[in-house]
């Protein structure tokens, strides 16, 4: 598939009833085409100042793909992962995030990287952190942003200071299609969100007021998330206006998992199986959670845990200004 094919595919009128009774191979083929088109369109949108299409075309295709996945069932959806979930933020994103965290110019941070082949540890530890940030966490029905739904989102604003208290906290449960009343909320074994939590709630994609409020918060301050590439990938395909603001540099993501790996020396001596950079393990090492205490896996709770753990880490490394 080339870019022209992707635009044509995304622009085609979709009639779900044409796929009723289709075998699994046909459904998987259609899903694969959708996801390849999304990938090509996202790449072109960010690479080209004038891509020739609006990002609403991409979001509409992602909506279409979710409807298709609802027809396939959760087992097929979770069997593999869409290519539209990023594994990490880009190098440019990391430079912008470090600059925002340390209140420095991006160009200055970039010069340091070129001059000393700086590792992430050197970057994050080179200057104290300061300022005000918005933290966010989402809970979803899939790992793939073009296959599942956001069922919970929480965010709050925090200043990076030892005795700081959060402000402007918000937590919202979001609805999903009625078919999940019988089958249950996918990934509930992780986030413990049940049908009763989302029953009669407005779906995220349909909540215009939530879109407006969340986009405003994300543009007001750089945002932090633990594995920020996850939130970034999901918001890209769910929140209208997010991709445009990201492209314009009005939204800056910062990954606290990167900060954990860069600053906490214990991570390097722990096994991969122990998930040393997980929020739960990090919070336990910094004494924010007890050794037998677990992460909640709810948006606002995890956001607050992330901020408290980050501040404890920065204090431990003498990086709080």
Kindly label every feature range from the protein language model:
Residues 7, 19-20, 54, 65, ...:
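N-terminal accessory regions of nucleic-acid-interacting proteins
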Residues 40-42, 46, 50-83:
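Acidic, low-complexity, intrinsically disordered interaction modules
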Residues 112-240, 276-286, 291, 297:
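Conserved non-catalytic scaffold segment of RNase H-like nuclease domains
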Residues 239-250:
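A short alpha->loop->secondary-structure connector
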Residues 254-273:
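Short alpha-helix plus adjacent loop in nuclease-associated cores
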Residues 298-309:
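Acidic, divalent-metal-coordinating active-site segment for phosphoryl/phosphodiester hydrolysis
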Residues 310-321:
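Mixed-charge, glycine-rich, non-catalytic linkers/tails in nucleic-acid processing enzymes
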């Amino acid at each position: 598939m080339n870019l022209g094919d992707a635009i044509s595919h995304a622009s085609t009128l979709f009639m779900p009833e044409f796929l009723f009774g289709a075998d699994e191979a046909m459904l998987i083929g259609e899903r694969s085409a959708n996801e390849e088109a999304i990938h090509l369109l996202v790449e072109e949108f960010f690479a080209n100042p004038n891509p020739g299409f609006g990002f609403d075309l991409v979001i509409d295709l992602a909506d279409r793909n979710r409807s298709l996945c609802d027809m396939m069932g959760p087992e097929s959806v979770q069997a593999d992962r869409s290519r539209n979930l990023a594994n990490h933020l880009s190098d440019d994103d990391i430079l912008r995030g470090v600059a925002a965290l340390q209140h420095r110019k991006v160009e200055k941070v970039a010069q340091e990287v070129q001059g000393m082949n700086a590792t992430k540890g050197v970057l994050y530890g080179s200057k104290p952190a300061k300022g005000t940030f918005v933290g966010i966490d989402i809970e979803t029905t899939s790992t793939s942003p073009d296959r599942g739904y956001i069922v919970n989102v929480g965010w709050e604003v925090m200043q990076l200071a030892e005795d700081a208290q959060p402000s402007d906290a918000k937590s919202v449960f979001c609805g999903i299609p009625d078919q999940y009343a019988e089958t249950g909320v996918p990934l509930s074994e992780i986030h413990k969100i049940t049908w009763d939590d989302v029953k009669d709630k407005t779906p995220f994609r349909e909540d215009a007021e939530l879109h407006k409020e969340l986009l405003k918060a994300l543009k007001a301050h750089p945002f932090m998330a633990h594995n920020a590439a996850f939130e970034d990938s999901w918001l890209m395909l769910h929140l209208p206006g997010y991709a445009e603001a990201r492209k314009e540099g009005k939204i800056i993501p910062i990954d606290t998992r990167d900060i954990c790996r860069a600053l906490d020396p214990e991570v390097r001596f722990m096994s991969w199986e122990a998930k040393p950079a997980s929020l739960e393990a990090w919070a336990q090492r910094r004494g924010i959670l007890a050794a037998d205490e677990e992460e909640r896996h709810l948006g606002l709770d995890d956001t607050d845990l992330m901020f408290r753990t980050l501040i404890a880490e920065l204090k431990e490394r003498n990086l709080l200004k």
